[in-house]
């Protein structure tokens, strides 16, 4: 779902330096 993607975005941002 699209909502799941939005929830994953913050997690990806945290992985970035």
Curated annotation (Swiss-Prot):
It comes from the Eukaryota. Antimicrobial and mast cell degranulating peptide which probably acts by forming pores in membranes. Active against Gram-negative bacterium E.coli NBRC 14237 (MIC=3.12 uM), against Gram-positive bacteria S.aureus NBRC 12732 (MIC=3.12 uM) and M.luteus NBRC 12708 (MIC=6.25 uM) as well as against yeast S.cerevisiae NBRC 10217 (MIC=25 uM). Has hemolytic activity (at 100 uM). In the context of inflammation and cancer tests, is weakly cytotoxic to normal cells, induces calcium signaling but does not impact cAMP production. Belongs to the xylopin-like family. One of its GO terms (biological process) is defense response to fungus. Keywords: Amidation, Antibiotic, Antimicrobial, Fungicide, Membrane, Secreted, Target cell membrane, Target membrane. It comes from Xylocopa appendiculata circumvolans. Expressed by the venom gland. It is found in: Secreted; Target cell membrane. The keyword Secreted applies. GO terms for cellular component: extracellular region; membrane; other organism cell membrane. The keyword Secreted applies. The modification Proline amide is found at residue 17. Its main location: secreted. This is Antimicrobial peptide Xac-2.
